[in-house]
């Protein structure tokens, strides 16, 4: 089996999304800001509309998803904020290698949107740019849709999901709207909000640190929470998966393995003084505003000064959360987050952004 991915419209800007030291909070029903004003970052929000889900991040990039029959396929409509943005429509499904063809067709209420496959993997194809908005509106108003001949798509909830995006981005009654277009010009759509700025701390030599043959300092071993993790993993290979890094001349980072499952490994992270002294749990915020010291499938990249994590919802990695936090010299700031809550076969490259920074 391989995943066939079909793409239409303009490619979006990079999907990285994440908050600063603290994730944003606020009223999830906040109205879109007026055009011509300086726009503040908005709260990241996820909504369910019958069979569809919709997500908008703190930069107001928005994504809507619907499932294909059998849970082996999906369709996505994505659009950046601002009057100049145009939607992207993507669809994918699992198919046997022998069944893959050089083209595929998205059909909505009898209207065909041919797509020619590219050579990359997963296989991708594009509807011509000039038909992307047409296809998105057809999904919003349609009764039946399918990919190829055999993959029926649910449109139950599509209209509500796309209307919510129109409202969130201030597109209602404009020529750019997905669900409720009108005569107002694109210039009346609010400008994108300003994204938080995160500046990494200077790089630091890493001699003696890393993810191989690291010995946890005594000051960390003495912590009750660490002792609990060590007891949990005492008879497991993951007990040796201690990681460390130098953050600056007086600050170190240590990761303690706490559990291992079939496809997920958990660590708790601590910021310490030299030699592991004075340990305190790292604060790793999420786009929802919650924070913890733990990661799943985490690691530290010293050249970027980032902790990354990829919490899989299941083994094939088609759902879950992918996060990045950057060390600023004072704390770890959330800089990117992608989260796909439904296990519909969506590859991470097509997951919705839930937080972005610059």
Give the residues covered by each predicted segment.
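Structural motif
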Residues: 262-270, 317-323
């Amino acid at each position: 089996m391989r995943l066939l991915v079909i793409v239409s419209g303009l490619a979006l800007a990079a999907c990285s999304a994440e908050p600063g030291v603290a994730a944003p909070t606020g009223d999830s029903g906040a109205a879109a800001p007026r055009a011509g004003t300086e726009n503040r970052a908005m709260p990241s929000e996820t909504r369910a509309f019958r069979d569809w889900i919709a997500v908008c991040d703190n930069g107001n990039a928005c994504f809507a998803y619907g499932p294909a029959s059998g849970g082996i396929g999906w369709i996505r409509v994505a659009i950046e904020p601002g009057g100049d943005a145009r939607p992207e429509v993507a669809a994918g499904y699992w198919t046997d290698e022998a069944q893959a063809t050089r083209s595929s067709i998205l059909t909505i209420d009898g209207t065909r949107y041919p797509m020619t496959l590219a050579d990359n993997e997963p296989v991708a194809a594009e509807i011509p740019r000039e038909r992307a908005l047409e296809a998105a509106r057809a999904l919003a108003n349609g009764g039946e849709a399918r990919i190829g001949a055999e993959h029926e798509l649910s449109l139950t909830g599509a209209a509500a999901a796309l209307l919510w995006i129109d409202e969130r981005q201030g597109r209602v009654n404009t020529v750019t709207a997905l669900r409720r277009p009108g005569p107002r010009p694109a210039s009346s759509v609010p400008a994108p909000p300003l994204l938080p700025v995160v500046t990494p701390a200077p790089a630091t030599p890493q001699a003696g640190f890393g993810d191989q043959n690291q010995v946890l300092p005594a000051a960390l071993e003495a912590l009750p929470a660490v002792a609990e993790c060590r007891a949990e993993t005492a008879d497991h290979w993951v007990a040796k998966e201690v990681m460390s890094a130098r953050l600056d001349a007086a600050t170190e980072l240590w990761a303690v393995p706490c559990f291992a499952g079939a496809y997920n490994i958990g660590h708790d992270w601590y910021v310490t003084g030299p030699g592991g002294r004075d340990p305190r749990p790292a604060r790793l915020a999420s786009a929802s505003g919650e924070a913890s010291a733990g990661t799943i499938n985490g690691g530290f990249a010293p050249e970027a000064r980032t902790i990354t994590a990829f919490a899989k919802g299941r083994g094939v990695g088609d759902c879950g959360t992918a996060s990045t936090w950057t060390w600023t010299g004072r704390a770890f700031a959330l800089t990117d987050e992608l989260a796909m809550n439904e296990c519909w076969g969506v590859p991470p490259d097509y997951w919705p952004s839930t937080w972005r920074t610059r």
